[in-house]
From Swiss-Prot:
Role, per record: A hormone that controls sex pheromone production in females and pheromone responsiveness in male. Also mediates visceral muscle contractile activity (myotropic activity).
Residues modified as Leucine amide: L64, L84, L120, L130
Protein name: PBAN-type neuropeptides
Keyword Secreted in annotation: yes
Gene coding for it: PBAN
Highest taxon of source: Eukaryota
PROSITE patterns: PYROKININ
Any one of the GO BP annotations: response to pheromone
Propeptide: 12-55, 133-155
Intracellular or extracellular location(s): Secreted
Keywords assigned: Amidation, Cleavage on pair of basic residues, Hormone, Neuropeptide, Pheromone response, Secreted
Length: 155
């Protein structure tokens, strides 16, 4: 077979354990000597023991226009409309509901609703798109649609 040379990083186990053991002993001796000389220093030059519990210092700054006291929140002169599906607290002012402001008059309800059969007890209250008023008196009852295949215009 072909020989590609020695495998890089491959060492025998016996040599690796002896090398590691010697390096570990040297590290222990160095740490022991360091501790010995550190203890010889005067007390003022020795570092204080670090605290084992790490605490994060939080500085609370309220937002502009707000105060730290929560009991002085006053909702005077504020028109508050809750989100859809939420209810207002009793002490907050309420704006009239949309159903009360835009309730259609009985004569405005279209007579076409009887043409739609209600499903599951529903009634059809037809309302045009916002900003549009439908006037069916102006629409002719019979509309004639003519299409020309030879591009002649009908009048």
């Amino acid at each position: 077979g072909l020989w590609f040379g020695p495998r890089i990083g491959k060492r025998s186990l016996r040599m690796a354990t002896e090398d590691n053991r010697q390096a570990f002993f040297k590290l222990l001796e160095a740490a022991d000597a360091l501790k010995y000389y550190y203890d010889q220093l005067p007390y003022e030059m020795q570092a204080d023991e670090p605290e084992t519990r790490v605490t994060k210092k939080v500085i609370f700054t309220p937002k502009l226009g707000r105060s730290l006291a929560y009991d002085d929140k006053v909702f005077e002169n504020v028109e508050f409309t809750p989100r859809l599906g939420r209810r207002l607290a009793d002490d907050m002012p309420a704006t009239p509901a949309d159903q009360e402001m835009y309730r259609p008059d009985p004569e405005q309800i279209d007579s076409r609703t009887k043409y739609f059969s209600p499903r599951l007890g529903r009634t059809m209250n037809f309302s045009p798109r916002l900003g549009r008023e439908l006037a069916y008196e102006m629409v002719p009852s019979k509309i004639r649609v003519v299409r020309s295949t030879n591009k002649t215009q009908s009048t």
